[in-house]
Amino acid sequence: MSFGFGSGGFGQNNNSSTFGGFGSTPTTNTGFGSTGTTAFGSTSNTTGGGLFGGGGGGFGSGNTFGSGFGSKPAFGTPATTSSTSLFGSTTTTAGGTGFGSGGFGSTNTSSPFGGGGTSLFGNKTTTGFGSGTSTFGSNTGGGLFGGGSTTTGFGATNNPGIGTNVGDPPGTAVVPFSPTVEKEVNNPSQSNSYQNILFMDAYKKWSAEELRLADYNQGRKTAAPGGTGAFGSSGFGGFGTTSNTGGFGSNTGGGLFGNTQQNTGGFGTTNTTGSAFGSGGGLFGNKPATGGLFGTSSSQPAQSGGLFGSGTASTFGSSNTGTTSTFGSNNNTGGGLFGSNNTSSKPAFSFGTSNTSTPGFGTATTGSGFGTGTTTNTGGGLFGNTAQNTNTGGGLFGNQQQSGSAFGSGTGFGQQNQSTGTSLFGNTQQKPGGLFGSTTTNTSGGLFGSTNTGTSTFGQTPATQNTGGGLFGSKPAGTGGLFGSTATNQPASTGGLFGNLNTNAQTQQPATGGLFGNLGQNNQAKPSLFGTSTTTGGGLFGNTNAQQQTGSLFGTSTAQQQPQTGLGASLFGSSQQQQQQPQTFSTSITDISAYGATTLFSGLPDDKIQNPGPLATPLSGKAKVKSRSILPMYKLSPANASRLVTTPQKRAYGFSFSAYGSPTSPSSSASSTPGAFGQSILSSSINRGLNKSISASNLRRSLNVEDSILQPGAFSANSSMRLLGGPGSHKKLVINKDMRTDLFSPPNKDKQPQEDGTAARKTVTKRVSFDTSNVETPEKTIESSIPATDDSGYLKPDARSTANGTNGANGAKSSPVAAASPPEMEQVKGKELAVVHEEESPAPAQTDKPRGSQIEPGAYWMSPTADDIRAMNRMQRQRVVGFTVGRENVGSVQFKVPVDLSNINLDDLFGTIVILEPRSATVYPNAAKKPPMGKGLNVPALISLEHSWPRGGPTIKGRRLERHIERLKSIPDTTFESYDPETGVWAFSVEHFTTYGLGDDDDYDDDDYETEPESAVKSTPRPVTSPSISKSSTSPIDPDDTFEFRRSRRALPGAFDDAALSDTDEVANHAQRQGTLSPEPQDADTPLPSREWPEDESMADGLDEYQLEAYEEASQQGSVDEQEDFLPSRFAADNDAPQVPAGIMRARMRAVKKLNAPTKIEVAGGDDWTQILQASVKAPRTMDRATLRALNESGAVWEMKDRGSPPPQATATVSDGMGFATSIDLMKSLFEQAKAPTQPALTTSGKGFVKWPYEQRSKTDTEENLAVPRTNWGPNELLISTQHNEPNLLPVDAADDSATSPSTLARLQQYINLVSSKKQLQRVAGPEFRELAQGDSVWELAALLFDDNGEGVSQFWQQLVSEATDRALSFTAGLEEKAIICLAGNRVDEACRHLLAAGNFRLATLVSTIGKVDNKDIRAQLKDWRESNVLAEFSEPIRAIYELLAGNASVCAGVKNVPIENRVNSFTISQRFGLDWMRSFGLRLWYTSGVIPDVAAAVRSFQEDIEQDREPEPDSALWTLLKAFASREYDWSDTRLGWLLTKAIYTTGKVSFGEDALQKLDKASVTFASALTAASHWVPATFVLLQLSDPASREAAVRDHLGRHAHRIGSPRNLMSPFFTLQKFGVPEAWIWEAKALDYRSRQDSQQEFLALIWAQNYAEANRTFVTRVGPDLVIERNLPRLFAFAQLLFKVKKHLPNWERSAAVYLLYPMAVMQNQGSGKLDRFDNQLIDGLVALHSQTHGDIRQEAAIADMAEELIKCKGAAAASDPRLLQLLPQDVRGKYLRAQVLEAF
């Protein structure tokens, strides 16, 4: 609301509203103290103030922006003040003005007129009028006219209203309610209907609280026709009961002019006590029940007179009835200081009175000082007149037809009468407003802008269009007054001086801010003259931008929220921020006529109830501990359901006012912001959809049906419960799958809570779980790190601290008081449903993880860094060497070759192009954007993945570790580099990129779950955190005995020890067992808790793990398949039934357990709860014991082992009494001779609708193994076979050996005769020949593959699976399933006939072309169906047929992460329809390998599925042949096998390769050695060359080979060098040194070359090297000792040197002549020999400058040593250079003369 100036000052947002004068809580800017940079205040953050105080503007601002009225030099305000009010300061910084410590800018703690400091009018200790701390007698506060409990300017601020003498509220029974309709100005055809009684003319003068109080006083407290309104007690408006103190009313003390007995407000409240100038006990008169400064609405008689008014007559004016206070009173007595009144008192400043008496500043008949008018009014306040008289004259600020006060008349702060005149500030045709604002539609602009309809001083709420523009901007509709306006939803049309405010206000948003604060909420940022107001503005008297409660007149008073004032202290003081009472609408619960006539609600029945329940909901406190149950009590007790649920459904508009908006109402609990009307019936209730299972009147119920999965009437047979959605029968439980889908959808981890309170709320995603703890948790908010219990579905929510306040009740913002209470989940102590907070995901169930898996992935990194790469030029970026991308705690990708980064955005590299996840690395996840191989990053690379431990973590050792490493080595398309068991780093190389890694399901098969031999016997169960399942920990139990596992089990005589076969379902995820929704993916790398039975001593002494493994393998391979059971009991028909030994107990008990135990259903992660419920209901249960025994004995139980949906078969009827299935039968088998049943028929149970998910199985446990028993030839050509799937040796009667029975031998002889006569063995022969026929099939397939290159395999395979196809068709019922069985047997025509019979003509047409046309269109169609969520409408057989049409014979992919009704499960075609491996391979052979069947492609496709555990590994000779054929592509460069076989065959002497056999062998050796050399294996190649038969060729080849690799031979001193390997191969050492000499020569190391040649015994080459290079170099270097030493080496072998005397001997004689015969003066024999050698050597230099220089040097040295004898020798002189020779000749001539 605005006090004046129409639009609320300068730079107003016009978005403020809330009813009430001075108690609103605006959040927008005002002209006087906004948080934006407006004209009079800068952008202070937290200490907003008003015009005369505070940090935001006005007079005495300490802000950063000096406004015109708030600069520091102007009024002496220091910069450190936080709020400075006009009449008092609240800070401690010094700095006084002319008015003492108060005034305009003082920052002392004293008040201006009697504060603590030395001021103009008083000091701190001695006040002017004797009061304790204030000049005017205030005891506690620093108010000017009477202190309150707060140090404000004018007293208390108990949210007083600004109302004047408007009379008492009449109640709501006077005028019937009718909606107020107003037409839009811009669109006359559109009307606005206000469904609020306060908009009616008869009630608009009063607030809802006043009307309600009047109804209460008149006795209307219930739903009677004359009842009162239904608003309850709230803080709506400025008349609440807040405890703030401020302005003009004191809480405790008496002021100068009167004592305030009971918290009077500043501007006229409805309290019973007086204010500063009208209360009793003061200097100027005591009035116990008078009003405030500007007039009150009290009607009590005055008690005594004061200085300016007495009880009988006033000093300055008389009155007939009573006294008037100084500034006006409601009493009809005496006059006040400035005027007299006979009928009622007038205010002190009669600016608008029109009484008959003559006030001080006005006449009795002509109106107020600023306007004339006829007067019949009895008096008015300072700011308003209560009369409704006609005003005929024009005032200074506008024409007023009826007596308007200075600030408006009529209602206290706004005139509502017609006006015809114009004013200085604009024309006001209707209802002149107050001093600064008009309330009518303006047709012309005034000085300060046009003022529109109905804007009173304190704000009106009309919605009209402004047409004119003013100096400060035109406001289109409902500009506010001084205290703010509440114009609704009108756009601004013009811009003013201080900013264009043409931004549309939000609906029901305040439009303006007032002088005393902006009263808006959630304003938008709008520009002003001095800047954009980025935060909400403060008013002149303080900003109160709280979001819910309205504030007081001079301060902020919020309810349970922190004060959010923008500019600190206000002019009249800041509020104490005391907590208000909670908003509870506690009145008029059943009154439907609160808003008018009952016709409005006539169509609704009466909603009166006997016990409405509590009207207030406590915000804190612990809930009462209740007895725990899975469902609420009213759901468990159908008899009480109607009493608890079916409350009277009689509500106006479908909801109850008593509960609406409270925390317990459905609308509040579903909203994230209670009290913000987020779920109101008028606005945003559409944000939350109503589910089908909840009736349309769910808002009327007192119990919330959303707390449970089931409907309230699910278990009730009462017919009335059908209205609530109940099934109406105890026997029929209807589960609505569409109810609350968010309860069962997987949690969204990426979901972030909404921070913006005004943003649209999404659908609430509550989750339910069962609280299993009766222990009260401590009241503290901590991070939940307690692991969830293993056997409960309880998901403990995060009790994290409410940093942003979103952990309140039901997701509401938590208040400071509520924050101390325990979290909501911890308050619930019963077994009722616990609601997890809406904005949070439930914490995952914590389990102990192996070391390393707890490390979270870190940040990405690259080398070189991104900055270094960006600094490169384009050419450099095209070849970045050593580029590596990594991620902390995950791994790295190092590219082996230079990569081209010129076309790669480095910002998209991390997480988009290169994705590094734990145990996985992906480059180019989008295949469409992947460049060709060798381009971009799709190049060879080295990948290192951390934490690649086995499932058990780094502690796994032994065979499991070895298998893990083998698994790593077998990853396709990768080259294993290394694996570090300690760190878990797995390094491997790839040639191109896709997704590489180790999935959690890729670690082990079930035979990997072994434990190391335990050294000690444990008597207690191992903890569930163990990652492995003990082989000897699971004891077979009787499935009928539920508590069998609690008993101590002992080993039975003759039986195996309790070591259960570890299947994958035993180590399934624990969360799947419980049926709960785990927030983590089901394949997370977490240890799988084992379900172990208690161990005792009898379990410790069992089989060793290797024996156990062998036993399991034999057990699985000896099992029987249901479709190829070639060994029924007829096989042993000639013999007596074998005895049932105790040793086979374990296998049989496991079979019975498989069928008889409660079925363990696993649903993949993310599936809905209904599948678990349906699976548990429809899953197979206990069977007839006779049937179980029959199946067990016949071996048919193995048909259903690890099957998802076993095919139906005929039911067997076998007499009870044979075999065993319980412990009783087991005992009989141990001590009695039990017989097996004779020839039982093969039976299986019928298929149920529940499909088991695919589970990992051992490669040895396959259908082929189950189908064919292991048969082998024994001694004496006897056929040995295991019988009845038993791996152990059967007890055999010595007198009757079944292996040598005549029948068996007769069948063998018959088969031999057939084969020898070359007759075709029919595969459809009797069972006794089937296993023999398989051997014949192997030979036939081998001939087709290797003789005919695979031609004819298709027809052969169709004939091979023909019998299995016929048998499966007889067991299949559905036509679509029969079509798939036919397709598996390549019977396309028959499949089309089945589809035509089913009426699916289009699909039959497509099937007729299967395998013959391109299937890309079908693949595209399937993709579209999957993306559009249509696959849910298809049955699984239809989906499988379409997948086959698309060329996919493996897995039908499902659809996840969609609503439940659109989810589709994945399944493997072969497992879903019970296909064996041969028919599954046939699907790939006929339909996926192309138009012409490609056997090799089909084999590779099937092998890939086997490696990915989609298909079992066949144990068949047929599959071995197929793999050999598919991998027969020969690499002609690889001659290893040919060389080895050739050598091996030739050395036997039994095979000859012809006359040139040796040449052929040598050629193979040379070829193989060349291949090895090309592969850098030159050392093994040397060994191959040594195998050459011809010695000369062998020597030449080896020496040549060594010469080419001489640089790799190494030093003989290094034992690890190839030097010693070559010696071990038998390579002569001379050949090795010769090769090394070549290496030294290439490096120009002549001395080492010389030595190597010496050791290679190549003396001639050594001599040549020494004479040409080594000797001359040593002579020139003057290294005579080494020269002599090297020459001695040749001297020792001079017999091998024919030219010794003329070559190397020179270098031996020269050092001897120089060192031994110096200065002798004569030449001896050796000297002459040396000279001859030099002459001979000189003739061989051939111009070599090195040799010539050495020879000249030796000749000159010899002349120097021998003197004249040598100098006179012409042989030496001719060896010298010409200049040197001339020197010696001249010397001889001179000596001669």
UniProtKB/Swiss-Prot annotation:
GLFG repeats: 50-53, 143-146, 255-258, 282-285, 292-295, 306-309, 336-339, 381-384, 395-398, 434-437, 446-449, 470-473, 481-484, 496-499, 514-517, 539-542
Transmembrane segments: none
Lineage of the species this protein comes from: Eukaryota, Fungi, Dikarya, Ascomycota, Pezizomycotina
Domain characteristics, as noted in the entry: Contains FG repeats. FG repeats are interaction sites for karyopherins (importins, exportins) and form probably an affinity gradient, guiding the transport proteins unidirectionally with their cargo through the NPC. FG repeat regions are highly flexible and lack ordered secondary structure. The overall conservation of FG repeats regarding exact sequence, spacing, and repeat unit length is limited.
Protein name, UniProt field: Nucleoporin NUP145
Primary enzyme class: hydrolase
Species of the source: Chaetomium thermophilum (strain DSM 1495 / CBS 144.50 / IMI 039719) (Thermochaetoides thermophila)
EC number(s) on file: 3.4.21.-
Superkingdom of the source species: Eukaryota
PTM comment, free text: NUP145 is autocatalytically cleaved in NUP145N and NUP145C.
Gene3D superfamilies per UniProt: 1.10.10.2360, 1.25.40.690, Peptidase S59, nucleoporin (3.30.1610.10)
Family: Belongs to the nucleoporin GLFG family.
